[in-house]
Regions:
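Metal-dependent phosphohydrolase cores
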Residues: 1-163
Length: 163
C-alpha cells in the first residue's frame, strides 16, 4: 500500500465531507445523507481498485498500468452510484439512455465534484468545471435539472458570503 495514495483517499473523503456539510449547513437540500457520505468511495480500498489507482497516479503510466486503471475505474463507477456513469444504460435495442438518479446520489455526486474546490480553496471552481464537462455527461433531464438547481443555490450562497 502506498502512503501517498492512502493519504489522497483520506484527504478526498474529508473534502467530500466538508462539501456535504457546507451544503447541509446552508440549507441547499432537505435530504440528509450522513451515513452515505461516511462510506463515500470505500471501494477505492478494494483489491480491484487500490493498486491500479496507486500505480496510475503515483507510478509510471505504462500501457499495462493504463489498462489496469481502466478496469479499476469501471469497477469504481459500477459500484458507486454517486457517479453519473452508473446510471447510463447501454443496450442493443434502444442504444444509450440515462436513468434518473435518486436525489441522495446527486447530492453525493456534487459533494464529490466540489471536494476538489475545497482542496484548492477556490469554492467557485466547481462552476467552471461543470460548464467545461457537462456536455460529456449523459444525465437524465430531471437529474440535470436537479444538478443545476443545486449548483445555482451553491453559487447564490457563496455570493452572499462574498457580499
Amino acid at each position: 500500500m502506498s502512503t501517498k495514495y492512502t493519504q489522497y483517499i483520506i484527504e478526498h473523503k474529508e473534502n467530500v465531507l466538508k462539501a456535504y456539510l457546507w451544503l447541509k449547513e446552508h440549507g441547499i437540500m432537505e435530504l440528509t445523507i450522513d451515513e452515505q457520505i461516511n462510506i463515500h468511495d470505500m471501494s477505492k480500498y478494494t483489491e480491484e481498485e487500490y493498486d491500479p489507482y496507486d500505480a496510475y497516479f503515483y507510478g509510471n503510466k505504462t500501457k499495462k498500468v493504463q489498462e489496469e486503471f481502466d478496469y479499476a475505474w469501471l469497477h469504481h463507477i459500477h459500484n458507486n452510484p454517486h457517479h453519473w456513469q452508473y446510471w447510463v444504460l447501454i443496450n442493443d435495442e434502444d442504444g444509450t439512455k440515462a436513468l434518473e438518479m435518486p436525489e441522495n446520489y446527486v447530492i453525493e455526486m456534487i459533494s464529490d465534484w466540489w471536494a476538489f474546490s475545497h482542496k484548492s480553496g477556490n469554492l467557485y471552481e466547481i462552476f467552471d468545471w461543470y460548464k467545461k464537462n457537462k456536455k460529456r455527461q449523459i444525465l437524465h433531464e430531471n437529474t440535470r435539472k436537479l444538478v443545476e438547481e443545486i449548483l445555482d443555490k451553491i453559487k447564490a450562497e457563496l455570493d452572499k458570503e462574498v457580499d
